[in-house]
Structures are given as structure tokens and as C-alpha cells.
Amino acid sequence: MNFDPIDDFDDESQVSAELVAGDGDVEASLRPKSLDDFIGQPRVREQLQLVLTGAKLRGSTPDHILMSGPPGLGKTSMAMIIAGELGSSLRLTSGPALERAGDLAAMLSNLVEGDVLFIDEIHRIARPAEEMLYLAMEDFRVDVVVGKGPGATSIPLEVAPFTLVGATTRSGALTGPLRDRFGFTAHMDFYEPEELQQILMRSAGILGVNLEVDAGAEIARRSRGTPRIANRLLRRVRDFAEVRADGIVTMDVAQAALAVYDVDQLGLDRLDRSVLSALVRSFGGGPVGVSTLAVAVGEEPSTVEEVCEPFLVRAGMIARTPRGRVATAAAWTQLGMTPPPDAAAGGIEVRVNEPQATLFDPNGE
């Protein structure tokens, strides 16, 4: 079956800044409900099972849990599962939303014993709120300051025992005192294609998509090791199958749909290729700082650093060195260009010859 990925396609229809009605419900329906339902991350699941079961046997709240890793790997889903496994209520917030200590105090005062408090992007929490969180995590109390100047008084406020689950894409950006107060840290890794294929087949069943096995494997290979991307591509391929085919997602349909959405066989999208192109064509392969690279592609540095780089580094196309980002020979080859003689063949060679900065180290410019 042949498809023209260009005919009758409106480029402007690819991007929408608004959340389409029902997308939130779809996302919720695809989330696993228990550790047994969770596909992938076997080491993290085993560790969490021990932490949670031990706490239930003791009749106490588990230690505070920090989950780190790139976006889209299931940190929020895991927080929901933790609350479900404990039979507790889940309270959700994010680091940027906690600008003042009073914001955090109000949330903590409403917790009941055993609740799970989930703070997404915890590395972005404001310093006053973070300092209040220290005492709440250790002693389950906070000191609320009333008044100003010499007449100010500190009123102790008891907090019900709770479990804090923090999620971060940049564990290196957490302060030492905050990081040390977590009793368990789970490092989420990218998924294998076989695991993503299982996730896709499960999601297809929930969404009512007729997904053939080889088509699921093809989508999984292009999903950058990330379940969120895999499920997003599945929905877009479903749209293509319903509009331009007979609704069945075959290998041909999947490949044609992914071509429409500019996802190549490695899973690189338009932004990834723009980053590689700027690094190679504009800066001769580097080294170049992330801020300069972000300006060249018209994106925020955080977008390049947190969305593009994790996969490009893992794919061996970009190396993070103390002097900046460097394109490997694989990046030149991906762009159809001949790499210079001194270009590293891949991430391993670069790490041997020059130490790389940590992937999520904010100082790795």
C-alpha cells in the first residue's frame, strides 16, 4: 500500500498550543494502576516494592522518595501507583507553584496521616518553601512566622506524617540538604524497544486501535525510549489510519504516518535534526554552549537540554564536554555529511579522550 505523506496535509495542523478536549482523560486511561501493571523499569519496581511492603508491614509511612530521569518515563505514573499501593490519597503540585513558604504551609496543613504529596519538578521549588520543607520532611512540623521585625513570632505547626514523592529531570540541580532528606532515590532509565512495544499493544487495546505487531515494533523503535512519546505517536498513527486508510495500523500505515509527522527511523524529529544541523553546519561540530545552540534553533536552552539532548547523547550523536557540546561522527553521518578526521566515532570515544559533563548537570555548558 502506497501513501503520499505530503498530499492534502496542512503543516499548520501539526502544532497546537491548546490541550484538545479529552486528551487528559486519554492520558489518565493509559496510566498503569499498579506496580504489576507497570511495564519496564524492573529494578525500580523491585526496589519500590520492597520499600512499600516494608512500610506496610511496620504500619508506618514509607521514607520520602525521589524519582529522577528524563521527561516522559513514568515518574508521575509511579507516584500515583505509590499512593494506590499504600491505599492513600495523592496530593499533586509542582515546584514552580510553590513560590512562597506560605504556599507550602497551606498544602501541608491539609494533609492527613499517610497521604502522599507529589511535587513535580521539585528542583524548581523556591528557596523559602524548600527550607520549610526540610523540617516537614524530618520532623513532620513547620514553623510559621507571624508578623515582621522585632515583633515577629514563630508558631510551630504539626504536620500529619506523610510521604513526599519528588520528581526531577535534573537531580544535579537539587540542593544537598534537600536531596539528603530522601530515603530512597529511583533512577528512571530509557526503555528498551521490546518494552515500548508491550506498552503500545496495551495502549492500543485501551484505545480500541487495531495495531498489528510489526507496526507496534516500528513505532516502538522510533519512540526514543520514552513511553510518553510512544503513546503520542500511537494516537497520531491512529488518526492517519482512520483518515487515509481502513483504520488498521499496518507496517505500511505506521511508516507513512510517521513520515508525515517528521519522525525518522531513529526517532529524531524536526527539532532534533535542527539541533544537529546547527551544531554541525553552523558551528563546525562544536564545541558550543547550550545557550548559543538554543538561540541558533530558536528554542529555550532548557528545551534543548531536557527534551533533545538526553536522546541525542544516548544515541551517541552529541557529547557533553567541559568546553561545550560536540557532534560525533554519527551526527555528521546522520545529516549525510562526511565527518572530519578528528570527529569522535561516538560517545564512548569522546568519553575516553575528554571527560563529559553529567547529562543533567546545569554547569555542563
Curated annotation (Swiss-Prot):
Residues 192-262 are annotated as: Small ATPAse domain (RuvB-S). It is found in: Cytoplasm. Gene3D superfamilies: 1.10.8.60, P-loop containing nucleotide triphosphate hydrolases, Winged helix-like DNA-binding domain superfamily/Winged helix DNA-binding domain. One of its GO terms (biological process) is DNA recombination. Residues 1-191 are annotated as: Large ATPase domain (RuvB-L). Has 3 domains, the large (RuvB-L) and small ATPase (RuvB-S) domains and the C-terminal head (RuvB-H) domain. The head domain binds DNA, while the ATPase domains jointly bind ATP, ADP or are empty depending on the state of the subunit in the translocation cycle. During a single DNA translocation step the structure of each domain remains the same, but their relative positions change. This is Holliday junction branch migration complex subunit RuvB. It comes from Rhodococcus erythropolis (strain PR4 / NBRC 100887).
